[in-house]
């Protein structure tokens, strides 16, 4: 997911996305531990998506404190 797409979402939607990504990462790690994960690169992409969501949330928080 692109950062521009994330910036168009509301803060509540971003928090929902963050929770979804975290649960997906948990599931992927569990699959990796049990040897069922075929696409290990997916973990990397989910981690990056989590970072993007957190970055957008931090930008909004910073903007609110400055405004």
UniProtKB/Swiss-Prot annotation:
The keyword Ribonucleoprotein applies. Keywords: Ribonucleoprotein, Ribosomal protein. Pfam families: Ribosomal_L29. InterPro entries: Ribosomal_protein_uL29, Ribosomal_uL29, Ribosomal_uL29_CS, Ribosomal_uL29_sf. The gene is rpmC. This is Large ribosomal subunit protein uL29. GO terms for cellular component: cytosolic large ribosomal subunit. The keyword Ribosomal protein applies. PANTHER family: 60S RIBOSOMAL PROTEIN L35/50S RIBOSOMAL PROTEIN L29 (PTHR10916), LARGE RIBOSOMAL SUBUNIT PROTEIN UL29C (PTHR10916:SF0). Belongs to the universal ribosomal protein uL29 family. GO terms for biological process: translation. One of its GO terms (molecular function) is structural constituent of ribosome. SUPFAM superfamilies: Ribosomal protein L29 (L29p). PROSITE patterns: RIBOSOMAL_L29.
């Amino acid at each position: 997911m692109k950062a521009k797409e994330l910036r168009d979402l509301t803060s509540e939607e971003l928090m929902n996305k963050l929770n979804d990504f975290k649960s997906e990462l948990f599931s992927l790690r569990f699959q990796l531990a049990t040897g069922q994960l075929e696409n290990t690169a997916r973990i990397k992409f989910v981690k990056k998506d989590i970072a993007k969501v957190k970055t957008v949330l931090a930008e909004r928080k910073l903007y609110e404190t400055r405004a």
